[in-house]
Amino acid sequence: MQFLGRSISKSIRPSLNSTARKSWVLSSQQFLSTSSTESSSRTRGGGGGNRAEKSSEEWPRPMEVPYQPKIANSIDLIGYVHQPVQFDSTLDGKFWAGTVISHEPSSDSKSESDSSSNFWIPVLFEGDLAHTANSYLKKNDRVHITGQILGDVIQSGANSDQAHVQLFKSFHGSFSHQVMVRDLHYIEGSKAMPKVLPTLDQNEGVLKHSASVQRGREFGTNLWFDLVDKPNEWCDYREMKQNGSVNPKHPDFKKKDGSQALWLNNAPTEILSELKDVKFDIPKYAKQPKAGEESWKDLVDNMNKWWDNRVDKRTPKSPDFKHKETGVGLWLSDSPSWVLEKLPPPKSKTSDIYGVQEMF
């Protein structure tokens, strides 16, 4: 463009010089007046000069709005499911699903060089929405997603294929950012909605975060119906969790072969009502009688029959003393007032076993 501009300038320079010589014949006052008028006309666009003279105040300043954390880093996109959905659950009963959204459908015939132009966005689904995504989303489905961008650290030296593997293994890592999905929709006309969804959702083409998990035989959902249909294959730990016999994070139901576990906080609504009429096998644990005055007297009189856990309690909720034979537990917070002054100094379980004496 610069070269073209110089060529044009050279071609018109003689005519400009000729015009300039003629203009110098005029008086200086007339020249200045003419130049001023022409300059003003060019600047103001002819006759509408007031519009250009107005300052930026003519254009309204953007309004201020309060900061909203829920909207921060929000994202709203339409794309294609690039990879099959990966599903997993954690020991504390949370369910996760992950996939990658791309700006165009994936093609098996695409060469590796073409893949460099793809725009990939890793997305995560949590809870009920993870079940929904795992049940219905398929590769190349066109979807509308809203959610929030989560920052992450890129693992050095990972190529695109390795990045997908790392994402599906842990749903974290390899990608610098991921999207935690809040709402999931199908794009109208892109595919038929699953028939098991309510009619309202079929018409709107919407998969909502609060969509109830239907009785489809998919992983994560069918386990609850297997629990109801085959209660003899499951153990019920609900009562034990309430009385402290097992850890509060222990599964509410666990298959007898140890292959599956379920937590009530993730149960579908329709399952909760059915569980009331189902009888399960309850694991046999030594029943701990409620500690009374006699147990505290026995503790003071026969300390060698009790485990002293005051120093090395496994958890804050564990008993301070536990009978070696009956399994009865005692908590100092429930002890009578006369007990504390009669108890010996704390002694660990290790020293009790090996006969280690504390030196004072």
Swiss-Prot record:
Record keywords, A-Z: Chloroplast, DNA-binding, Plastid, Repeat, Transit peptide
GO molecular function: single-stranded DNA binding
Protein location: Plastid, Chloroplast
Domain SSB as annotated: residue spans: 71-188
Region named PDF region 1: 224-276
Record's compositionally biased regions (Basic and acidic residues): 51-61
Annotated PROSITE patterns: SSB
Top-level taxon of origin: Eukaryota
Region (Disordered): 28-64
Gene Ontology process terms (BP): DNA replication
Comp. bias intervals (Low complexity): 33-43
Transmembrane feature ranges: none
Transit peptide: 1-61
Main location: plastid
Region (PDF region 2): 296-344
Gene Ontology CC: one annotated term: chloroplast
Biological function: Binds single-stranded DNA.
Identification of the protein by name: Protein OSB4, chloroplastic
Annotated source species: Arabidopsis thaliana
